[in-house]
From Swiss-Prot:
It catalyses: glycine(in) = glycine(out). The lineage of its organism: Eukaryota, Fungi, Dikarya, Ascomycota, Pezizomycotina. GO terms for cellular component: mitochondrial inner membrane. It comes from Pyrenophora tritici-repentis (strain Pt-1C-BFP) (Wheat tan spot fungus). GO terms for molecular function: glycine transmembrane transporter activity. This is Mitochondrial glycine transporter. SUPFAM superfamilies: Mitochondrial carrier (SSF103506).
Length: 318
């Protein structure tokens, strides 16, 4: 098995991340839109929001409102994130003591990506996500505004022009503080939980296959299943811990003049609505994050595995 970071080109990771991000964004846009609508007002409920959209004109189109900015944000955001994460993880693995021994011990594993310590997984995941989030923040602001029913934007150009005219360039980075505080811990915790879960499930699956007399090498379907289950579990834990920051971020991006910055928003939300408002949209976010993260990571790892396999075949023929 490859170490992933060494044999696969950074282009593989960029395009694998791009494809996995686009697919998950398109499939799960309705959940993202519902989360935004529920978080924008204390009076909104999930059922009421679904009923309101479904009874309105063009319900199917309305559920996928904002798909273009979501696809741009998630697609290119995932591409930047995965390629940055791979570069950081590969660099960290080169400097880790006992790397060769660690790789040998982890030979029967559902992933071909570099194996790092828990601290390194936490740090690289957090840094890569913050960097990708900063680059994609203008698209994120456009996405949230476009999904909300507080604004009557007819196009992304109209939304961009209005934000720039009323708020200036800083308007495109509204909520970045809350986003970074949410995304950095989430991404770090996700990579940490994801890698731990994969390691344990891979070890368990290998023992089961050895007991049954099958090959000790995990099959493609088994590896994909392990990666998907690990992604769901990691997303659920990370999402629950970081949801308050997501709720704060959404309020700032939708109503910057009312909520100002992260500290002001936190105080105002708590004083006016209590602790519960920080967990608005948690159920939708867990469901969406669990599926989107698991889908994106499983597809990403499978594309990388296939790219490496193809590369090895080509190199063997040369």
């Amino acid at each position: 098995m490859s170490d992933g970071g060494k044999s696969s080109s950074s282009y593989f990771h960029f395009f694998a991340g791009l494809n996995s991000g686009i697919l998950s964004a398109v499939l799960l846009q309705p959940a993202d839109l519902l989360k935004t609508r529920v978080q924008q007002s204390r009076s909104s409920t999930l059922f009421g929001t679904i009923q309101s959209i479904a009874s309105g004109p063009n319900p199917v189109r309305q559920f996928w409102r904002g798909t273009l900015p979501s696809t741009l944000r998630t697609g290119f955001g995932s591409a930047i994130y995965f390629s940055s994460l791979n570069a950081l993880r590969h660099r960290a693995s080169l400097g880790a003591a006992g790397r060769a021994d660690a790789a040998a011990k982890g030979a029967e594993h559902s992933s071909s990506l570099p194996k790092l310590s828990n601290t390194a997984n936490l740090a690289t995941g957090a840094f890569a996500r913050t960097w990708a989030g900063f680059i994609m923040m203008p698209i994120t602001v456009l996405k949230v505004r476009y999904e909300s029913n507080l604004y009557a934007y007819n196009s992304l150009f109209t939304a961009s022009r209005d934000i720039f005219r009323t708020e200036g360039l800083k308007g495109f980075f509204a909520g970045f503080g809350a986003t970074a505080v949410r995304d950095a811990p989430y991404a770090g915790l996700y990579v940490l939980f994801y890698e731990q879960s994969k390691r344990k499930l891979s070890s368990l699956a290998t023992k089961i296959e050895q007991t049954s007399g099958a090959s000790t090498k995990l099959s493609t379907s088994t590896s994909a299943g392990i990666n998907f289950v690990s992604g769901v579990a990691a997303a659920g834990l990370g999402t629950t811990i970081t949801n308050p920051f997501d709720a704060i971020k959404t309020r700032i991006q939708l109503m910057p003049e009312r909520y100002g910055n992260m500290v002001q928003a936190t105080k105002k939300m708590y004083m006016e609505e209590g602790l519960r408002c920080f967990f608005d949209g948690l159920g939708i976010r867990i469901a969406r994050k669990a599926v989107s993260s698991a889908l994106a990571w499983t597809l990403y790892e499978e594309l990388i595995r296939r790219a490496e396999t193809l590369k090895e075949v080509v190199e063997d023929k040369i």
